[in-house]
Design a protein with these regions (language model features):
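Surface/interface-facing alpha-helical segments and adjacent flexible terminal/loop regions used
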Residues: 1-93
């Protein structure tokens, strides 16, 4: 779920395709909702969040570079790594 969330945040931030924004935002919403559910069901998962962060981001970045080869994406996460921020912030605004 975290990889899918990163993919769609990256798309929304760096791919200028307004006709796709709605779909990407819905996916971001769904992934955030599902991650929050997982954290409520198993709060101990939060401890592993930062450990998984870099691997998930790197996997997402590789995938999105294949999907959008003509677009530029940062090689590192450009925003805060706080769980609450990732699950709530509108990074594209």
């Amino acid at each position: 779920r975290l990889e899918r969330l990163f993919e769609h945040i990256l798309k929304r931030c760096y791919v200028n395709m307004p006709e796709c924004y709605r779909g990407w935002l819905l996916t971001i919403f769904d992934q955030r909702r599902d991650i929050n559910k997982l954290f409520r069901q198993s709060p101990s998962l939060k401890r592993h969040f930062l450990k998984m962060f870099d691997d998930c981001f790197e996997t997402s970045l590789k995938r999105i570079k294949i999907e959008y080869p003509d677009h530029q994406f940062p090689n590192t996460w450009q925003f805060g790594r706080d769980i609450d921020m990732i699950l709530n912030a509108d990074f594209w605004e």
